[in-house]
Amino acid sequence: MSNPAFVGVPLFSRRNREAIKFALRIGQLNAIAGSEIPKIRHGSILGEINAASTSIFSQVSIEQSLRLSPSAVSEYENCPQQYKYRKIDKLPEPPSLDAERGTLVHTVLQDLFEIPAAGRTVESAIELLPSRWSAQLADKPVLLEMVTNEKEWLDRAAALLKTYFTLENPTTFEATHREMHLENYFDTNVYLHGYVDRLDVAPTGEVRIVDYKTGKAPRPGWEEKALFQLRVYALLYWKNNGVLPRLLQLIYLGDGKIVKSNPTTAQLESTEKVLHRFAKDIFISIEKEYWPAKPSRLCDWCYFKSICPAHND
C-alpha cells in the first residue's frame, strides 16, 4: 500500500461482479456512485454495466483507515464473505424485524431515564412505546409494509420491557451515560469504536457497562463469546479514561437472564491482542481480495446467500 495509514478498497473489482449485479437489481447504483450515473434498467445488466464501467466506476475510489467494532469483528470471524458484502461493498439489506424490535426497546429504555426516578415504572415504559414506534416508522417507512400486525408487534415489545423490570429496578440508580460512543485509534491505521447502551458510574467511582439484548442468553459455555463485545467497550473506556470498569453486564430480555463478568487487566490486554489479529487478517483480505465464505447454519439467515459463491457454484 502506498500509505500504510490507509486502505484502498477495490469496490468494483472482477471478484465483485456478482455483488454489483445484486446492487443494480435493487436499484442502488445511483446511491452508490452518485448522480452522474445514468439510470440502469433491470435486465441485460452485465452489458450495460460493461458499457458504463470505464466512465463511471473509474471515478470511484475509497481510501480510509480500517474501522473496527465488536460487530465487525464478529462478522469477519463468522464469514469473511459476509463482512465484505457489508463493510467493503456496503451492499444494502432490508431491515430485520428482530433488529428493529430491538431498536424500539432500546430507545424506550434509553428514554426511560429521562423520567424522574420515582416515575420509572413498567407502565411509564410501555406508555413510551407508541410515540417511539411512530418516530421509528417516520425514519424507516418500509417498516409499515413489514409489520403486518401492529398490535402484536407492540405487545411483543411490551413483553420485553416487562421482563426488564423483573431484572433491574431503574428507580434505584441513575444512568450516567446512555448510547455512549467510545472510540480510539488503537493503532495508526485502525479506528476502534462502539456504542454502549448504558454506562453507570457509582458515587464511589466504580464503572458498570450494560448492554441490552432482546434475544436469549447464550448456552452454558458460550458466555465468553458473548462477553467479547463488552470487553471491547471496557478496553476503550480503560484506554480513554484510565479506569478499569468494575462490572460488565449483558441483560437478556428474551429469557430474563443476566450474564455478568468482572474484567481484569489481563483479559482486556488479551482482547486487544485479538483485535490486532483480526485487523491484520482483514488488511490481508483487502490486499489479496481474499474473502472466503464459511458455510454454516447461519447462511439461512443471511440476506446475501443468493449471491454468495459458496451457494452459487
Can you annotate each of these PLM segments?
Residues E174-M180, L192-V196, P295:
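Short beta-strand or tight-loop elements
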Residues V108-M180, Y185:
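A non-catalytic, helix-rich entry segment at domain boundaries
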Residues K90-D98, I115-R120, R219-P220, E289-W291:
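Short, polar/flexible loop-turn hinges at active-site or ligand-entry regions and domain interfaces
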Residues L182-K273:
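Mg2+/Mn2+-dependent nuclease catalytic core
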Residues S2-G102:
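C-terminal, charged and often intrinsically disordered regions of DNA end-processing helicases
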Residues L104-I115, D281, S285:
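Solvent-exposed, amphipathic alpha-helical segments
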Residues L97, R101, V105, W153, ...:
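Hydrophobic (often cysteine-bearing) scaffold residues that line and stabilize catalytic clefts
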Residues G8, S13-N16, A23-L24, L29-G34, ...:
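Metal-dependent nuclease catalytic regions and adjoining charged, substrate-binding loops involved
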